[in-house]
Swiss-Prot record:
Annotated residues for binding of [4Fe-4S] cluster 1: 19, 55, 89
Pfam families xrefs: Radical_SAM, TRAM, UPF0004
UniProtKB keywords: 4Fe-4S, Cytoplasm, Iron, Iron-sulfur, Metal-binding, S-adenosyl-L-methionine, Transferase, tRNA processing
Compartment(s): Cytoplasm
Record protein name field: tRNA-2-methylthio-N(6)-dimethylallyladenosine synthase
Native organism: Natranaerobius thermophilus (strain ATCC BAA-1301 / DSM 18059 / JW/NM-WN-LF)
GO cellular component term, pick one: cytosol
Membership in a protein family: Belongs to the methylthiotransferase family. MiaB subfamily.
Encoding gene, per UniProt annotation: miaB
């Protein structure tokens, strides 16, 4: 039996934890399995192969994964021929991979982030020889092109422009599990986007741990803004998004590029992490509070309707009440459209995990609750400010909240629910906003847009 016949008559199911990069990797795994003859299962119980794509950014995510792996023991007892594979950032940490291999003997395959291309061969080994395998590569120098994708979404797609990160923020595990920055060749990116356009997709989101530093590791002279300009020329693609931006490498040229484009969406995900210069320095972020505020002011001066979202960590080692108040003050002054807020979580192997002055859990809990309360009020007001305006929406599908409604996003990445015909899915329509809430908007189709 050849490699590309192994999956004939078999089904797979993937559980994905973590960020958009992991979602992209799961699409790659699905593409490989599709080529091998596997079909997607409707549930874990139906699967012959179960893959867990893991996240290592916070301890809570790791504990959740370990708990899930434990429960799969009973599933495999009832279906002994099922194969279980664990991949992603969590098992790129060798001590974690070894623990899972040792403690969870029902797991058949363990593979890391740097050898996802080898998954078909690892699966073949297990299926034909019946032996478990653990393979974690430490070679973070390669970029694998032409890997297959199996995308579920026919409207929008993730497109990776770079892998890894060179920043080594003191709290962050990502450079250790994703490796050094490797920018993809712009021609390969362009080819992928052109292919997506031919398939009828309308929107792409460019992914990188730090999109602003794209190209700095390439021999050719190309910047992120150069890449955006080239991709904007591709016919069929209506919207281009990107994430994540790093304040240290952000420049005004990006703002100008957005202002001059009718395709690149006016949304900046710009993680600030803290509002205290003392904490920013301890984090190794490479910028000050003042520099960050200057970026925000530059964006709003040129693109007043742009949305700005962020990430914030509370309870970082050494964070005193005064530091936290500076973060609250920044939030209240910048008025982010939304914020992903996190309690600091120790990551083994990072400098921050060894720092003195670790903040106690009760203090962290009080601070995160206060921050969420402040930001939620701001988010609600930012969305209420859009009431009675008409927004251009890319209709993504039936609303998850109400199957009688459609949902889609504004150019500024606001989720909007509204009544409409399912034939509009995949189309751009104008919607008049009637209600704004903290996390979403409601509206009705602006009839003039359908005539």
């Amino acid at each position: 039996m050849t490699l590309y016949q192994l999956g004939n008559g078999k089904k797979f199911y993937t559980l994905t934890f973590g960020c958009q990069m992991n979602e992209h990797d799961s699409e790659v795994l699905a593409g490989m399995l599709d080529q091998m003859g596997f079909e997607k299962a409707a549930s874990e119980e139906e699967a012959d192969l179960l893959i867990i794509n893991t996240c290592a950014v916070r301890e809570k995510a790791e504990q959740k994964v370990l708990g899930k792996i434990g429960t799969l023991r009973y599933l495999k007892e009832n279906k002994p021929d099922m194969k279980i594979a664990i991949g992603g950032c969590m098992v790129q940490q060798e001590h974690v991979a070894n623990k899972i291999y040792r403690d969870f003997t029902h797991v058949d395959i363990i593979f890391g982030t740097h050898n996802i291309n080898r998954f078909p061969q690892l699966l073949e080994h297990v299926m034909q020889k019946g032996k478990r395998v653990k393979e974690i590569s430490q070679d973070d120098s390669q970029v694998f092109e032409n890997l297959p994708h199996k995308r579920e979404d026919s409207i929008k797609a993730w497109v990776v422009i770079s892998y890894g990160c060179d920043n080594y923020c003191k709290y962050c595990i990502v450079p250790y599990v994703r490796g050094q920055q490797r920018s993809r060749d712009p021609e390969h990116i362009k080819y992928e986007v052109e292919k997506l356009a031919k398939e009828g997709l309308k929107e792409i989101t460019l992914l990188g741990q730090n999109v602003n530093s794209y190209g700095k590791d390439l021999d050719q002279n190309i910047s992120f803004t150069n890449l955006l300009e080239e991709l904007s020329k591709i016919e069929g693609i209506e919207r281009i998004r990107f994430m994540t931006s790093h304040p240290k490498d952000f420049d005004k040229e990006l703002i100008t590029t957005l202002k001059e484009s009718n395709k690149i969406c006016e949304h900046f995900h710009l993680p600030v992490q803290a509002g205290s210069n003392k904490i920013l320095k301890k984090m190794g972020r490479g910028y000050t509070r003042e520099h960050y505020v200057d970026i925000v002011n530059d964006i709003r001066a040129e693109l007043p309707n742009a949305s700005i979202t962020t990430d914030i960590i509370v309870g970082y080692p050494g964070e005193e009440e005064e530091d936290f108040q500076e973060t609250l003050d920044l939030v209240q002054n910048v008025k982010f459209d939304s914020a992903f807020t996190f309690v600091y979580s120790k990551r083994s192997g990072t400098p921050a995990a060894e720092m003195a002055e670790q903040v106690d859990e009760q203090t962290k809990k009080g601070r995160i609750q206060k921050l969420i309360s402040v930001q939620q009020e701001i988010s609600e007001q930012r969305n209420k400010d859009l009431e009675n305006t008409v927004q251009r929406i890319l209709v993504e599908g039936v609303s998850k909240n109400n199957e009688d409604m459609l949902s889609g996003r504004t150019r500024t990445d606001k989720l909007v629910h509204f009544p409409g015909d399912k034939e509009l899915i995949g189309e751009l329509v104008d919607v008049k906003i009637t209600r704004g809430h903290s996390w979403n908007l409601y509206g009705e189709i602006f009839e003039d847009s359908l005539t």
